């Protein structure tokens, strides 16, 4: 993935970590990869959260997505999700792709939970990398991205202006 492949990343995202994690995602999407990250020092998730148990190394049905897009580019079944994690889903549940008649591929990302201050910029950047890769390998131009956030939250310690939001109820 080259810098020309993706749009300007949101402020606060880790470009190197995002590229490392998305490369691992695609390398492991067909179950032929070890489940531990090959470059943990580069991983955004491992460096920031200490997690080496990400939902990579398992099937995200990438082959089925490519098949759907190649058979019928306007397929409503062009969905990328990890069916093995349906009872313990990661924050990003799925990526749904929809193409236009002009060869543009849009992506809707559904998150069951979103840490807006710390993690959402990284999710946006990594989702854009995933869209760029899917487009490049399937002959589309990247289109718009839509994010559906459930349980969007900001942790108090991550707020830049905590004092402005502190309520003193007195005694």
Residue ranges and their predicted role:
Residues 1-171:
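Terminal, non-catalytic protein-protein interaction segments that mediate quaternary/complex assembly
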């Amino acid at each position: 993935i080259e810098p020309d492949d993706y749009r300007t990343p949101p402020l606060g995202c880790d470009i190197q970590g995002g590229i490392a994690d998305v490369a691992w995602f695609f390398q492991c999407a067909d179950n032929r990869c070890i489940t531990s990250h090959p470059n943990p020092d580069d991983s955004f998730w491992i460096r920031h959260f200490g997690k080496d148990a990400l939902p990579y190394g398992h099937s995200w049905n990438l082959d089925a997505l490519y098949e759907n897009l190649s058979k019928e580019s306007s397929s409503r079944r062009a969905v990328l999700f990890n069916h093995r994690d349906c009872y313990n889903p990661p924050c990003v549940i799925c990526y749904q792709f929809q193409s236009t008649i002009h060869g543009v591929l849009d992506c809707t990302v559904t998150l069951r939970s979103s840490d807006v201050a710390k993690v959402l910029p990284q999710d946006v950047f990594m989702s854009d990398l995933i869209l760029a890769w899917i487009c490049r390998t399937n002959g589309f131009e990247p289109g718009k991205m839509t994010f559906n956030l459930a349980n969007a939250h900001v942790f108090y310690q991550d707020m830049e202006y905590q004092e402005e939001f502190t309520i003193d109820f007195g005694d």
